[in-house]
């Protein structure tokens, strides 16, 4: 049971779930969705590549559980007409305890040499998808679901799997997924689901009964939603004449509506079952029940997929992958993971492309960059020599618009310098070259200083702070990585480094979430609610069959989920905490808030309107912690939300002496 959760938080915000609706159609779901692109490979502190194969060719490969007995390992292969890959297939048993020493850790399988399309090609292929999403996301009627891609013949039966547990004298058959009926939802799940459902999908309208008896004995309510984000409308005739086959069209429309309603009911059932399986897996890990762990991972691997039709189906795929990684590290003599060789390569370039894709279809990166830039411009008003220290500059997407704003001033600064910090020398050099080109086009005297090092290893002398410069620090989604030290020494050292530069402004952008609990159940509960909103936002803007969507979800958010769930200690870097935590810590260490100006709030709202986000259910902006605001009573930060779920907060700070 997930600690600290109210009983309604675990289903996708895109699906306005009502627990009674599920009871009306509580028959066991027999469809199995293999995890075609699922990954069980990545060490938590690294970034690895994942090449996408062409969509015309099913993804995945046959991987089996090892049935270890008398040192004679015979894998049970799952053969299908096409090569689907599920989580169940990716976990296998090691040799028996007699050969245990050779089997610990991950076994890397180098048999997959296929190279996929580049993300640049994916972007080109998805251009039509992008324009279609922007045209239709604000429509209020009609619905259309893209066909679910499984990469496997749906008629292929799921074969029973058995698990041999090392350490005992007898062989134990732990599960047969095709014959197992999932346990009922825990009592706390009802309120969790209701809370998450309130976040989003005001876009799916179901024909479920208005009042049904809840499976767990709860009260009755109505469930209504209709797909708006992926709506597909047939244009009406433009010559003013009526359709001579209107009676046929009405019949087809009713038939399509019935099919969509059935699909919606099935999706609700599957989402409920996935939540049930995820919580059951957490309980099994806590009780160290190896047989139950294997059952829950295998069953969830059948139903969840990164290419699933609903956001929750895709989201649970990444959570169960992370739990599989976790148990493989906890019990390396029992669980083995054999990922393809291509996962063992870093993919910084593809991560950058995924970030650019996200920038095209959602306002998230633009909100962070533009709001941070406005705070920096306010701090640099009237300054002649400005120096920005960016602790994670990446491709430098934030700075071209900043240069343009500086150059448009009546008295632009005489000299602009950016110190960019990163771990890739090549990427830093390329970023510096691009920024030089932008600055030259704006007639700004510009200097770029790269610092190739890890965040915790940066020292003051590396930053080249000079006299007469007005220094500002830009820290976007980096400070939470210093919270791994339970004593607080790492964050104090980092903030001490920032103070030593004597900045006129520290701009801080962080996830508005609580993902730093010591309890795994609490982290999963809080992060599931948070990333449900993120997946919902992406689902609204990209079609279900979009390869771009797969890459954005996997490379940006899937990695964060793996780190939050699978890692501990210094390897767990995604330790997100909310603005109130940062405010308390910064004030204790001598920083004070610069507040939020009205201009910054108005600009953020204007940006969201470009994405149609002034409508209810989309992105919205609000000031954070207004009661304890900074100068002039202004709020301490500005927060981007998806419906009722906070996502990111940006704030500006300065040292006490300024």
UniProtKB/Swiss-Prot annotation:
Location of the region described as Disordered in the Swiss-Prot/TrEMBL record: 43-85, 96-115, 209-265
Domain GRAS, residue spans: 265-654
Any one Gene Ontology BP term: regulation of DNA-templated transcription
An example molecular function term from Gene Ontology annotations: DNA-binding transcription factor activity
Short motif (VHIID): ranges: 386-390
Assigned keywords, A-Z: Nucleus, Transcription, Transcription regulation
Region (Leucine repeat II (LRII)): 430-462
Biased composition (Low complexity): 214-228
InterPro entries: TF_GRAS (IPR005202)
Region (VHIID) location: 355-420
Subcellular location: Nucleus
Function: Probable transcription factor involved in plant development.
Protein name in the entry: Scarecrow-like protein 28
Record organism: Arabidopsis thaliana (Mouse-ear cress)
Gene name, Swiss-Prot/TrEMBL: SCL28
């Amino acid at each position: 049971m997930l600690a600290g959760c109210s009983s309604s938080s675990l289903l996708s915000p895109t699906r306005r779930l009502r627990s009674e609706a599920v009871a009306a159609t509580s028959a066991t779901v027999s469809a199995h969705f293999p995890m075609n692109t699922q990954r069980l490979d990545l060490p938590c502190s690294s970034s690895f590549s994942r090449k996408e194969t062409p969509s015309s060719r099913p993804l995945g490969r046959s991987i089996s559980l090892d049935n270890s007995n008398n040192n004679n390992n015979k894998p049970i292969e799952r053969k299908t007409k096409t090569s689907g890959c599920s989580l169940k297939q990716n976990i296998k048993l090691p040799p028996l305890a007699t050969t245990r020493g050779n089997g610990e850790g991950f076994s890397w399988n180098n048999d997959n040499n296929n190279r996929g399309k580049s993300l640049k090609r994916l972007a080109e292929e998805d251009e039509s998808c992008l324009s279609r999403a922007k045209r239709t996301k604000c429509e209020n009627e009609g619905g259309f679901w893209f066909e679910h891609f499984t990469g496997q013949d749906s008629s292929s039966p799921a074969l029973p799997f058995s698990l041999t547990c090392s350490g005992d004298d007898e062989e134990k058959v732990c599960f047969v997924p095709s014959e197992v009926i999932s346990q009922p939802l825990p009592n706390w799940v009802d309120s969790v689901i209701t809370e998450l459902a309130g976040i989003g999908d005001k876009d799916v309208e179901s024909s479920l009964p208005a009042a049904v008896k809840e499976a767990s004995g709860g009260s009755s309510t109505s469930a209504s939603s209709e797909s708006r984000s992926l709506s597909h409308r047939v244009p009406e005739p433009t010559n003013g004449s009526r359709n001579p086959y209107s009676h046929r069209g009405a019949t087809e429309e009713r038939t399509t509506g019935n099919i969509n309603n059935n699909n919606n009911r099935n999706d609700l059932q599957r989402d409920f079952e996935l939540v049930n399986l995820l919580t059951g897996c957490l309980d099994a890990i806590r009780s160290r029940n190896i047989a139950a762990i294997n059952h829950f991972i295998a069953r969830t691997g059948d139903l969840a997929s990164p290419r699933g039709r609903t956001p929750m189906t895709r989201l649970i795929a990444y959570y169960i992958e992370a739990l599989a990684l976790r148990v493989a590290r906890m019990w390396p003599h029992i669980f083995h993971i054999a990922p393809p060789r291509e996962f063992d390569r870093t993919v910084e370039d593809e991560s950058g492309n995924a970030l650019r894709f996200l920038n095209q279809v959602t306002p998230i990166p633009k909100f962070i960059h533009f709001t941070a830039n406005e705070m920096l411009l306010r701090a640099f008003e009237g300054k002649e020599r400005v120096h920005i220290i960016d602790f994670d500059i990446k491709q430098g997407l934030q700075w071209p618009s900043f240069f343009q704003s500086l150059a448009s001033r009546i008295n632009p600064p005489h000299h602009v310098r950016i110190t960019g910090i990163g771990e890739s020398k090549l990427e830093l050099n390329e970023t510096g070259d691009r920024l030089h080109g932008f600055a030259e086009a704006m007639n700004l005297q510009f200097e770029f200083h790269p610092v190739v090092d890890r965040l915790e290893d940066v020292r003051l002398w590396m930053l080249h702070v000079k006299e007469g410069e007005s220094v500002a620090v830009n820290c976007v989604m980096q400070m939470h990585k210093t919270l791994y030290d339970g004593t607080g020494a790492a964050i104090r050292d980092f903030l001490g480094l920032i103070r030593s530069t004597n900045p006129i402004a520290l701009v801080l952008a962080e996830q508005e979430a609580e993902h730093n609990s010591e309890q795994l159940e609490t982290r999963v509960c809080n992060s599931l609610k948070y990333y449900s909103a993120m997946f919902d936002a992406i689902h609204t803007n990209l079609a279900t069959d979009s390869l771009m969507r797969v890459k954005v979800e996997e490379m940006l958010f899937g990695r964060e989920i793996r780190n939050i769930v699978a890692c501990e200690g210094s390897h767990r870097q995604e330790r997100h905490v909310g603005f109130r935590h940062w405010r308390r810590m910064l004030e204790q260490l001598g920083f004070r808030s610069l507040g939020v100006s009205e201009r910054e709030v108005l600009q953020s709202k204007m940006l969201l309107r470009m994405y149609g986000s002034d409508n209810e259910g989309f992105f919205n902006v609000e000031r954070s912690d207004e009661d304890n605001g900074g100068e002039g009573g202004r709020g301490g930060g500005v927060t981007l939300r998806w419906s009722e779920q906070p996502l990111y907060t940006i704030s500006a700070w300065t040292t006490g002496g300024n």
